[in-house]
């Protein structure tokens, strides 16, 4: 999947870069609604995994000072995706859902499942490597 900075369309998968290794994902509905598996803005400082849930914010809150990128799907990906209206419906049905786990149930899993009907995260291996290097003191 390719990612570009452009105007979002209802049901698009959207991401922002958090740091060099990780991105944050959500489902774009409009500039006033992005549904994401994230931390409530009022709880960001000192928040734990237990505080993370599916919530709705606007695009400015979601982008947190960075530029949002929207998924530009190949023909094959477009054929596999759930239609945009149903994508938004699925995302909204999960508002308030918890159970966040950075490896097994993260924001990318959430967005991908809403768009394609199955969980997937390209970041799993990055997160595993980051956790391993932090635990062993490696800085690679």
Segments from the language model and where they lie:
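Short alpha-helix capping/helix-loop boundary micro-motifs
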Residues: 1-3
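Glycine-rich catalytic cores of cysteine/serine-nucleophile enzymes that process amide/ester linkages
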Residues: 5-75
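Short coil/turn linker and secondary-structure boundary residues
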Residues: 8, 12, 79-82, 105
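Aromatic/basic micro-patches that form nucleic-acid/chromatin recognition or nuclease catalytic surfaces
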Residues: 61-95
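Activation targets extended, charge/polar-rich intrinsically disordered C-terminal tails
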Residues: 82-140
């Amino acid at each position: 999947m390719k990612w570009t900075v452009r105007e979002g369309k209802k049901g698009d998968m959207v991401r922002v870069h958090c740091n060099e290794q990780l991105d944050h994902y959500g489902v774009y509905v409009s500039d006033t609604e992005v549904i994401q598996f994230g931390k409530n803005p009022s709880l960001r400082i000192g928040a734990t995994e237990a505080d993370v849930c599916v919530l709705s914010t606007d695009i400015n809150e979601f982008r947190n000072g960075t530029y949002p990128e929207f998924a530009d799907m190949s023909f094959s990906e477009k054929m596999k995706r759930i239609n945009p209206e149903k994508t938004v419906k699925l995302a909204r049905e999960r508002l308030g859902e918890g159970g966040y786990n950075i490896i097994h149930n993260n924001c990318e899993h959430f967005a991908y499942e809403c768009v394609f009907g199955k969980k997937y995260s390209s970041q799993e291996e990055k997160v595993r490597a980051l956790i391993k290097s932090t635990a062993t003191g490696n800085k690679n």
